[in-house]
Amino acid sequence: MKLVLNGKEREVQAKNVEALVAELGLPLAAALVEHNGTALLRSEWPKTNLQEGDQLEIIRMVAGG
């Protein structure tokens, strides 16, 4: 299905947010996700199903020092 991910259209296989983060190869504990304008708690990812045309912003947290 096609989603808008960080402002760019992208074809993905994932059916929910948790699977999408895994498909993208991001560490599950180090990502923040906004789905159609709503920030999601980590516990909501497996329950948040994706649909054609959904808009997501995924931010990878990186610590520095």
PLM regions: where:
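Ubiquitin-like/PB1-type beta-grasp interaction modules and other compact soluble beta-rich domains
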Residues: M1-G64
